[in-house]
């Protein structure tokens, strides 16, 4: 590459810290909004941002993520790669946003709620601005400028939370939330243009159609695979919105939405691995890639498994505390959603994007699972209602992740001897179950305690027992102990673990 690359740990810690700050800021939004709006307004709000979120996930078609493939490999064409991404996102954003603004009935067709039509213009403008500015974090990370990326993540989430909450508290209307979204998108777009001018001087001065064609050829199958993945992630929500009331959709979306911390560590790690594995693959270092991937699976499992078990034993208390008692009926969907958490550690994207020859295999698998999801969801909805839709989604996501992870290990020539790198996963599961049983004992001992108290005490008890059990079992490595000690020594003046010299 011709440039020194920061270590994986260094980059991941920076991005993880930023995402943790961003995550805790995002908790403020649902806690506040569910106390300002009634269930119907919450349903409309979540339908609006479902449409916006789907558009911002699907429309880039992998163009933004192509930066992770090209920027680590290129020295002379970096500006050409960046301007292609800028042009593509601006064009598709204008086309989609303009179509929704000019033909608002599109919204009522998508979610079967004519109430959204009155917001069409603002929804279209939000899609354009969020789509365009959404490349900011990825471009900085692909450029291995993790400090800037971390700063953008924190600033974007803080400003988003402050702006949306201010508009919600002052105006107390759905349209005010869209005003806030447009303002936020404008701020981030200006930040993007400033960063691109600083990191890629003169990027706007030259366009090469042959490079654009090459980049399009690379991203086309991955973009379609990404479309299939996003469709799979969001389609079940659209099916529920189509067949049930806005109030029912609000309940469903709370339980089936993003779980606490589900993307925080994974996204930080994947963002770093995308660029690093692309570079390693170019040099033919398959063994190093295999070790990196399996160690990443192990680290993610150490977090996702306990969070899943904790949600099973404290899910009701979590819903009441965060979303109030009016959303406690979201619990069955939250339980099904939690089943996917352990599988979230089985990351595949960094390898499947670096090994371009397998792009079409990924596309075929995701399209096949999308078809299965449609068949299962529409078949079960008449017998099991919303539970049937959610169960269909969980089944299809599970099957897809297992298939793609198996493909990833085959690409990397993994053997049975390599699985020793993830043998600690069983220790994490055992420790989480032990901690979960202790929390159940706490709930039995305090049957009349307030849910908020049970959540706080239960989470603290679970964390302590889990960490002690994992440490005693030997599932924490010395380098991980040192990293934890550095963090706790810096902020708490405390060394948690004893590490051998």
Predicted regions and their residues:
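Interhelical loop/hinge segments that connect adjacent transmembrane helices in multipass membrane
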Residues: 1-4, 8, 174-175, 190-234, ...
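Membrane-proximal transmembrane or re-entrant/amphipathic helices at the cytosolic face
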Residues: 2, 416, 440-501
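Signature of the first transmembrane helix
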Residues: 6-64, 88, 93-101, 126, ...
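Transmembrane helical elements of multi-pass membrane transporters/channels
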Residues: 10-26, 156, 180-192, 196, ...
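N-terminal membrane topogenesis motif
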Residues: 1-26, 76-79, 83, 147, ...
């Amino acid at each position: 590459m011709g440039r020194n690359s920061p270590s994986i740990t260094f980059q991941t810690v920076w991005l993880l810290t930023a995402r943790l700050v961003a995550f805790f800021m995002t908790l403020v939004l649902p806690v506040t909004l569910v106390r300002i709006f009634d269930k119907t307004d919450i349903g409309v709000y979540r339908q609006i941002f479902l449409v916006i979120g789907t558009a911002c996930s699907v429309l880039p078609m992998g163009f933004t993520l192509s930066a992770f493939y090209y920027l680590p490999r290129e020295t002379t064409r970096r500006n050409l790669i960046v301007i292609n991404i800028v042009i593509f996102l601006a064009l598709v954003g204008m086309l989609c946003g303009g179509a929704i603004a000019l033909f608002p009935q599109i919204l009522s067709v998508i979610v079967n709620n004519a109430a959204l039509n009155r917001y069409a213009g603002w929804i279209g403008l939000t899609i354009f601005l969020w789509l365009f500015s959404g490349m900011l974090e990825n471009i900085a990370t692909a450029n291995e400028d993790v400090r800037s990326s971390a700063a953008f993540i924190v600033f974007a989430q803080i400003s988003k939370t402050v702006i949306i909450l201010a508009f919600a508290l002052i105006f107390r209307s759905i349209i005010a939330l869209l005003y806030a979204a447009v303002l936020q998108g404008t701020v981030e777009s200006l930040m993007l243009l400033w960063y691109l001018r600083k990191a890629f001087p003169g990027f706007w001065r030259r366009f090469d159609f042959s490079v654009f064609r090459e980049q399009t050829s690379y991203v086309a199958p991955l973009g379609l695979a990404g479309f299939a993945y996003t469709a799979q992630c969001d389609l079940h929500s659209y099916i529920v919105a189509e067949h049930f009331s806005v109030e029912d959709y609000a309940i469903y979306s709370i339980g089936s939405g993003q779980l606490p911390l589900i993307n925080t560590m994974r996204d930080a790690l994947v963002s770093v691995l995308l660029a690093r594995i692309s570079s390693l693959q170019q040099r033919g270092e398959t063994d190093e890639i295999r070790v990196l991937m399996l160690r990443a699976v192990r680290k993610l499992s150490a977090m996702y498994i306990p969070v899943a078990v904790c949600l099973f034993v404290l899910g009701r208390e979590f819903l009441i505390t965060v979303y109030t008692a009016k959303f406690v009926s979201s619990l069955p969907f939250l339980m099904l959603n939690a089943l996917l958490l352990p599988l979230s550690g089985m990351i595949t994207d960094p390898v499947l994007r670096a090994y371009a020859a397998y792009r079409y295999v990924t596309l075929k698998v995701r399209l096949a699972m999308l078809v299965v999801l449609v068949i299962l969801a529409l078949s079960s909805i008449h017998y099991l209602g919303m539970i049937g839709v959610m169960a269909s989604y969980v089944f299809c996501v599970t099957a897809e992740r297992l298939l793609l992870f198996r493909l990833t290990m085959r690409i990397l020539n993994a053997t049975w001897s390599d699985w020793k790198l993830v043998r600690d996963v069983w220790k994490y599961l055992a420790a989480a179950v032990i901690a979960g049983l202790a929390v159940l004992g706490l709930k039995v001992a305090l049957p009349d305690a307030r849910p908020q108290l049970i959540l706080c005490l239960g989470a603290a008890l679970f964390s302590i027992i889990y960490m002690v059990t994992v440490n005693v079992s030997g599932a924490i490595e010395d380098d991980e102990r040192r990293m934890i000690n550095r963090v706790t020594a810096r902020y708490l003046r405390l060394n948690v673990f004893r590490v051998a010299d």
